[in-house]
Amino acid sequence: MIDYLRVKFLRFFLLAIATVLICLGLAAFQQERIEASDASETTIASTTWQHGSFPVENFQSYTSPFGYRISPIDGKRQFHNGLDMAAPLGSYVRNWWTGKVLEVSDGTVCGTSVKIQSGGWQHVYCHLDGHVETAANGRYLLDRSGGIQIWQGQELPVGARIGRVGMTGRTTGPHLHWTLRYNGSYVDPALVLKEMFKQQA
């Protein structure tokens, strides 16, 4: 009888632990949820993209899409907030849309990067060659070998060369990590590129 009660208690105890672990996992998943974009496929399809520029020269392939994935760095499930585009090291990166440089940065997982504002859109270019320097009149991204100097606050035309594909930050190979936000929410860059190509064809 005592063995029977022990087995029953053990089963109840294990079931309780499993329930707690599942609830904790679901809570973590809820916290991990990323704010959905208000740039729906309909909005993207109804926007004129004819003047946009593909963001990388010597493009080879898309290596990691937008959305949840298993990280190639640590093997954990994570939200990948952009689109990875492989290109040979040193390939030039071009400004997708006319806009103002909000920030140049380095020393993060994004590596050397440029963030540009174009109306309600923000576009970020990560893992660039070079580094950020500070002068009396502000901060700027410097890539001497590529002839690139981009200042925070600078207005940039569409298609301008703003950097080169590098290996800065957390990366497993040379590529451009390109992130888009519309009114503060992430947007799948592949949807925008697809519509852009359709309109430019």
What is each stretch, according to the model?
Residues 30-113, 118-119, 131, 157-158, ...:
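Surface-exposed, glycine-biased beta-strand/turn segments
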Residues 49-50, 102, 134-140, 147-160, ...:
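Acidic, glycine-rich catalytic/binding loops that coordinate metals and/or anionic ligands
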Residues 91, 121-124, 185:
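Short acidic/polar mixed-charge low-complexity motifs
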